[in-house]
Amino acid sequence: MKMVKSIAAGLTAAAAIGAAAAGVTSIMAGGPVVYQMQPVVFGAPLPLDPASAPDVPTAAQLTSLLNSLADPNVSFANKGSLVEGGIGGTEARIADHKLKKAAEHGDLPLSFSVTNIQPAAAGSATADVSVSGPKLSSPVTQNVTFVNQGGWMLSRASAMELLQAAGN
């Protein structure tokens, strides 16, 4: 009788394990479980990338450029990369003459202050440039345009205006 109870208990346990296994396989037989994400918020705007900063030079960059242009120890023939379109031979000779004349008359060195730098047309910027020197009673301020052509340089029109102003 003891043996019959053991066999009955073993069969019951086997039946329970078999039933459990059959239930598990029937759940898995339906294929893999796929979860779907449900949207929670409708109509909410997505965050945008921050606006890119305008392409403008720093005051230090422009001041350095202007100091290089006003250096009487360097010929204008070597300053072509500082002016849009370069500096032609005749222009270089005229500018060198005027700069040497200014040095002889004690008008140099010049000091530049660059303020109010603003983006302009694509690849350009404007700035208020104040020039002071030994013989200027007060700084002279002019709005000047700079262009970015692989590096910041003085626009051709502004270079001609400055050259004409220096001749007066």
Swiss-Prot record:
Residues 1-22 form the signal peptide. Residues 23-48 form a propeptide. Its main location: secreted. It is found in: Secreted. One of its GO terms (cellular component) is peptidoglycan-based cell wall. The keyword Secreted applies. Keywords: Secreted, Signal. The keyword Isomerase does not apply. It comes from the Bacteria. May play a role in the development of protective immune responses. Belongs to the MTB12 family. This is Low molecular weight antigen MTB12. The gene is mtb12.
